[in-house]
């Protein structure tokens, strides 16, 4: 039952984050859809860590380096997702209010992604690795 509550909480968090992103794009005072490019970062952010989890063996000394590289790449993707709306706002492609909404959405979405890996990342019967 705890897994179902976690799954519902994570889906609610994802919906709230996407709502902030859409508000930053679709409100009539902003009406620019450039911030939707951060969706690519949402898709790309878990990929390095997922690949590293599949490839490494915890007993191998190289596994630590592979995991650290995956965390480094994930960090670069997350920082880029936060930097892109700021660059758009500085270049006057979007308004600063839209930038604030997108950054709020980024925070919620990445917290949801982190929560997914914390809840479903263990090696038990209720793990995402079996999907």
From Swiss-Prot:
The keyword Transmembrane applies. One of its GO terms (molecular function) is identical protein binding. It is a multi-pass membrane protein. GO terms for cellular component: endosome; membrane. It comes from the Eukaryota. It holds the Pfam family Vps55. Widely expressed, with highest expression in heart, testis, adrenal gland, thymus, and spleen, and lowest expression in lung and skeletal muscle. Interacts with RAB13. Belongs to the OB-RGRP/VPS55 family. This is Leptin receptor overlapping transcript-like 1. The lineage of its organism: Eukaryota, Metazoa, Chordata, Craniata, Vertebrata.
């Amino acid at each position: 039952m705890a897994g179902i509550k976690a799954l519902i909480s994570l889906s609610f968090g994802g919906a709230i984050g996407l709502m902030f992103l859409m508000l930053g794009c679709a409100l009539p005072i902003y009406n620019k859809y450039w911030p939707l490019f951060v969706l690519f970062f949402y898709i790309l952010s878990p990929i390095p860590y997922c690949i590293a989890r599949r490839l490494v063996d915890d007993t191998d000394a190289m596994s630590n380096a592979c995991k650290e590289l995956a965390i480094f790449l994930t960090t670069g993707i997350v920082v880029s997702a936060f930097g892109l709306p700021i660059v758009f706002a500085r270049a006057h492609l979007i308004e600063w209010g839209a930038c604030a909404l997108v950054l709020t959405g980024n925070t919620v979405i990445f917290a949801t992604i982190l929560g997914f890996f914390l809840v479903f990342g263990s090696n038990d019967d209720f793990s995402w690795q079996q999907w």
